[in-house]
Amino acid sequence: MAKKKSKASNSARGYATTSIPSRSASSPANKNQVKGEKNNKTQKVEPKNAFKVENQSNDIGVDTVDAFDHLLLDKTLPTIDAETEVIKNTSLSNSKSFLHSWQTDIRLRKNDNVLGLTEDEIQQILKTFRDSWKSSLKESYAFSNRSSFSLRKRYLWTTFLSLKGMGFEESEIFGAFSSIPIVSIDEYITWMITENLINSEPSNSSFSYEVQPSNYTTFCRMLDEPLPANNPVQSNSRLVPLMKDFSNDIKHTPNKETQPSNQVDDSLKSKDSKPLTMSEVLTQLPEDDIPFDDPFDLTSQYVKVKLKMLRLQIANKKNSEEFSTLNLQLESITSQYLFSSKEAEIVFRKSRIEFMNKLKALQQKLENERIVEEIKKNGIQEDSQSTDDSSKDDDNNSESNDMSPHNDAETRADDDAYLMGDLFNQEEEDIQDTENDLLNANYTLLPLTTDKSGTRPSTTLQYELHKIGSNIKAEFKTMPIGKIGYQSTCFVRCSTGQKTFSDLKTVLPTATLAADYISMIVLFRLMANFTKISLQTFPKSFKEVYGKFSAEKQNTDLAEDAKISEKLDSIIKSKELETPTSATTSKLMAPMDNIGKFSGFERPPETLLNKWRQQLESESAEKFKVFRNQLPATMFRETIIDAVNNSQLLIISGDTGCGKSTQIPAFLLENSTKNGKAVKIYVTEPRRISAISLANRVSQELGGNPPSARSHELVGYSVRLDSKCTPLTPLTYVTTGTFLRLLEVGNEIESVTHLIIDEVHERSIDSDLLLIHVLHLLKQHPHLKIIIMSATLNAEKFQLYFEGSNLITIPGKTYPVHRFYLEDILSQFGNDKSFGNAAGQDVIEEDDYETDQQDASISNKSAEDAIVEMNLIPAWYNEKAINYGLIVYLLKYIFTEGDPKFSKCVLVFLPGISEILRVKSLIEDMPMFRNHRKFCIYMLHSTLSSAQQQSVFNIPPKGCRKIVLSTNIAETGVTIPDVTCVIDTGVHREMRYNSRRHLSRLTDTFVSKANAKQRSGRAGRVQEGICYHLFSKFKHDTQFLSYQTPEILRLNLQEVVLRVKMCQMGDVQDVLGKALDPPSSTNIIRALEKLHQVGALSENEKLTKLGKFLSQLPVDANLGKILVLGCFYKCVDAASSIVAMLTIGSPFRKSVDNEFSANKARLSFAKENTRSDLVLMYYAYCAWREICLSPLGPDEDSFAKEKYLNLEALSMTESLKIQLLSELKDMKLLGASDVDTCKSLKRSICRRFAVIPKEHDINSGNAEILCGVIAASLYPNILRYDYEKRQWSTLSTNKRVRILDVSVNNRSELPNMPSKFVAYTNMMSSTRASEYVNETTMVTLRQLLMMCGLKVENRVSVGQAKLDNFTVYFENVYVSASLSILRRFIETSLNEFFAEPDKRLLNSHLEVIVNIVSRLNYGTKFQKRLKD
């Protein structure tokens, strides 16, 4: 028979296999194996492109070449430098630690406080804010580029290994590294997760928040091949008997390179064949294979519909009508009340994985079947006789082993010979051809021997598999390869799948060695990551094999490390190119040229000095000398000048009218100018009206023109937003706050020669801080002369504070003033009880101020009886009230029945603008005062314009009487020259910190004795005067303080600390410890902590941009933050109204007699889902404002009476609101040229209302966004409801707190509350053990997470966000990534807004934020637990 041609054939089998690199070697002859063979045959095993194995003897192999060594030497080995090796090892260690911690955090995830988003919300967030988020990463993490190259590389390598261990693909990871700066691992996860969503591409990563599977589960997932039909996993560990397989007949021709594991050789596929696609495979999978047929189970129906939609997506039928129908079904299911999206998604994810695995397994099966069919068509078959003959010979010569399937090989060989007869002797030529084909197939014969000293690898494999899972087994299929040896295939199987391992290039001498060899491959390839195998237990030859495998693996890893190192180097270098140059950075970090730059003292030119000298000697100046010489201060001119020249500090105590504020600065200026000396004198005043009026007066007395910012006048002034002076002006009147800001600039104080601090007795925060500055200035600037002046000065205290400084006392020039007290007034009018009528009285609430210092309370009963006996005021008269009827009656009496010499000008002292407006309205209602030719009414208040304030100094025409309604502005510093009569209510309004409410409030309190004296003195400046005090002499003598309490002791220390930080005076405790009346260190520390929480101070106690705004607002820091955030979120009207009401007091009147009706009226302002007492107050304010601004409807009084509204509080609220809006405008937070107002269209206690531009007030009607702003400002004042204990407790300290029944969130409303969190304004203590709150605002998880706190630790890697000690969990990674982007955008936008208020949020961005935050996504768990 003609010799058959040798046909090249593929070395792959008809099923998926796993192969390793081929190894060629010749083996020593086995005596039993070559027994009976033809000795003249010579075998050649010659791999292509490798090496030759030649057999020079009659045995099968004699000369052996180590195939492993050739494999290692044939290629260029990769190398990495020592530094990279250290970086890799460190990164590997760090990554293992991180992954261990990450898996622990995943296991500890809780089902409480879980936050979710809809798919539409996620897409909306990503489309709107993702680009801004990426831009913010470049700015926030630019600092990472300043670290060393090796540190950045180590960080990226650690992050790479960690992300890969978490389930992300390598391509995704390096895509993130290349696209964004060097950021945290959570930011990288956010980028990768959202990148797939943006591009609508499925993610290949397996990352999720599910608990990581056990080793058994992970191992079974690796066995991803389908199990064969009717082939259950064996229950024992013995090897499976040899099975005849058609693949034994395939001629093996290896490729140039080893095929990867579990891959089918491409050479088996025809040129025209293409791999099966998923859509093609899907047609073979019946649709009825989808489970979940329960029509009453929403979760099952949800999963079934989603799987059908998945099939359509794979089949590219997403736009079909069927897909739209399924989408509608899905929406119908998810809209059901009992539907749980979280539970349904968990079930669907598991079902999707099972479905895709089944689809992949079917694809692999169909591909293998197709390949087998092609092989059969090609007719590649071998003679079965030669195969059986070789099998017979090999079986007869194999070594015995307990686990081997060949224990009785010889007997079976005889049986085969008997059964087959003479079949082996037929056609010897064909047998020879078949053997030649096998020998030319380029196999590698591995000459291993069995060493009984060690444990067989197959036994070790079964043992290790059993340790992972008892049902995991290894089965072997061993096949002879001609006469040269055996190959074995290993099937590692569990209950869900299998994995096939084989080496198609390597042949072993015996079947047992073949099974052990493939077991070594399985141990190396599959088991290395699950168990640590001791190589000492193996036979010597297999130790060497495993060592070779390890070397190969090490080289592979080394090549992979070199590849990763190269990629990381490229990425880091590209990041360095993106970093701003050092020149640019230094330019950005450089300070502004005009800040802190001192040009030194500038001496005016001689021509200007001569001009000033001529002015001081001019006729206009001489005219005022007669008046000036009559002032008591003129008598001390030389004494004062000598004292200033001879000492650095001088204290002057001058009574009212002595001329200290006008004359002493003029003395110093005149003396220096006439002597040719250039001076720069600053005079500080507590109020802007004082500074302006004094500057005008002194300029006039010195013969000059009114102050100007252009011409070089002798006198000028500088107040906030108004400056009329030049750098050469020698005498400048400034407010105390303005001078403090001048000190902040830098070395400007070097140009000042004289500093005069006036009205120091008022003890404002600014004046006390300036006194602390004086202590430093005296030491650092010896050339500086300082004068401290006051009318009611505690001289001894100030002398002690400044260590025995000089004191000059100047008597006042005043005329006698007749003082009448309340008992005198009542007795003069015959004790008319009409003055005691409650209507028209404004009761002073004692609860709003501390009485320990204000009222000298007497606790014992005998003392109280003594007070009743000594006080001459009738019992029917309420002395704790402002009696408006008495004020009007006094005015009428003064102008009609009183002495005409006291009726030229009457000054009435009132607490605030609302009282001024009320008295003005009552006066104008009287017919006698409507004649404007006979009576002129003026108002004096800080909110009025400068022109209106200056008008009070005008002298009315002859025959016209003058009435001035003023606050305590007219006490000192401002002298109205024609005042002859004073009506003193004895009350002033001041900001006072209520330690019980933990809140600062504007409070009406009685004045001090010094204040009362100053007020009465206003009537005796030009002639003999008269003063009516509307308080009793007994109250004045026994309950009034001697001096006013300093602001530093009665204000919230947060404001004091902010002012200290604003002035850059150094450590707060050191600075305040040097104050004239230092506060306690405990209160200072508490204030610092609060400011840290608000965000006004940084971690190193530096003033933040937000802190600078808060320091300029006259309210508490928390309330100031409401104003700032109100500007940011464009709800200015609501924010300013709420802050004003919290500062003034509740707009509701209390009714002891009819509490139920009052509470019902209050709740009538509530709208649907109103869960905030503060928002309820705002609704009441809006209703009152609407009544006043509408020409129709009920009048103000009847409406207020019906709704139990406090009109005085509402009027004061509107006045303070206008003032706050002016402050916001000055700080550029409110982008309006001026605060517009509109007049009331009805007769109202409030004449004008603020008008907010519409572009700044978009969201005042959105209650949810208002609640978010309130919560963000009051944080950490948050309460959480405890289900188990059924009580409210603080979020930070878990302290039990009660909510009073007056709150809209009281206990009776708990079942109706969709959230378990509330914010509170202040917490009060009671005589009971617990504490309570009464003004609360409900907060949602979204509002807490998106708007509250300074920094949220958003850990996308574990699906949680930490807000201080409070943890929120996310439903899935998409929710976590989306909310992380949204929170980052809000934080970045806020910082930009604080830095540049003109950079406001776009309305489109704000709309998305409001929609996300405002949705009531509370869930039903809270309500369910409450009902249980």
Swiss-Prot record:
Q: Which superkingdom is the protein from?
A: Eukaryota
User: What are this entry's molecular-function GO terms?
Assistant: ATP binding; ATP hydrolysis activity; helicase activity; ribosomal small subunit binding; RNA binding; RNA helicase activity
Q: Which cysteines are joined by disulfide bonds?
A: none
One biological process term in Gene Ontology: cytoplasmic translational initiation
Q: Where is this motif: DEAH box?
A: 758-761
Q: Which residues form the signal peptide?
A: none
Q: Name one GO cellular component term.
A: cytosol
SUPFAM superfamilies for this protein: P-loop containing nucleoside triphosphate hydrolases
Give all residue intervals belonging to the Helicase ATP-binding domain: 641-811
Where is this protein primarily located?
A: cytoplasm
Q: Name one Pfam family in it.
A: Helicase_C
User: Any idea which positions bind ATP?
Assistant: 654-661
Q: Where is this region: Disordered?
A: 1-53, 249-274, 377-413
Q: Which SMART domains match?
A: DEXDc, HA2, HELICc
Report the EC number(s), separated by commas if there are several: 3.6.4.-
Basic and acidic residues composition-biased segments: 34-51
Q: Does the keyword Amino-acid biosynthesis apply?
A: no
Q: Where in the cell is it found?
A: Cytoplasm
* InterPro entries documented for this protein: DEAD-box_helicase_OB_fold (IPR011709), DEAD/DEAH_box_helicase_dom (IPR011545), HA2_WH (IPR048333), Helicase-assoc_dom (IPR007502), Helicase_ATP-bd (IPR014001), Helicase_C-like (IPR001650), P-loop_NTPase (IPR027417)
Q: Where is the Helicase C-terminal domain?
A: 886-1064
Renumbered to this chain, the Polar residues biased-composition regions fall at: 16-33, 256-265
Q: What family is this protein classified in?
A: Belongs to the helicase family. SKI2 subfamily.
Q: What's the protein called, per UniProt? A: Uncharacterized helicase C15C4.05
The organism of origin for this protein: Schizosaccharomyces pombe (strain 972 / ATCC 24843) (Fission yeast)
